[in-house]
Amino acid sequence: MKKRLFVLSLILLVALDQLSKFWIVSHIALGEVKPFIPGIVSLTYLQNNGAAFSILQDQQWFFVVITVLVIGYAIYYLATHPHLNIWKQLALLLIISGGIGNFIDRLRLAYVIDMIHLDFVDFAIFNVADSYLTVGVILLLICLWKEEDYGN
């Protein structure tokens, strides 16, 4: 992926995350639940002071430091490995975008705005940036697993 396309994609993904959070705060009261696709997905507005599943509540500096380290390393890795396959680039793009999206919330608000609730399973409420991070990490693990299988 060309550097310009990567940066534009990064900006677009972070903007989408931030716009979704702005919309939720503007249209749904804190703690309110609104069905989006009945029985499948609801939207709610939750202020998360921790990480996934609300672990490590009120440890904002920990998350800031970890986020800076992970994003910094991912950017360093991209810069020092210019010939990565498209799947690894996409994985790192998603990880960086998700990290930045939640980082903005932590710096601006001291919490992360979560809003997506899966009605059909007992699962934590999450946001768009969390989705990027999850898909990015899974994709990166698949890439690394495939490399190991093929001895690359």
Curated annotation (Swiss-Prot):
InterPro entries: Peptidase_A8 (IPR001872). Pathway: Protein modification; lipoprotein biosynthesis (signal peptide cleavage). The chain crosses the membrane at residues 5-25, 61-81, 84-104, 125-145. The keyword Protease applies. It is a multi-pass membrane protein. One of its GO terms (biological process) is proteolysis. Its EC number is 3.4.23.36. One of its GO terms (molecular function) is aspartic-type endopeptidase activity. NCBIfam families: lspA (TIGR00077). HAMAP family: LspA. This protein specifically catalyzes the removal of signal peptides from prolipoproteins. Belongs to the peptidase A8 family. This is Lipoprotein signal peptidase. It comes from Streptococcus pyogenes serotype M1.
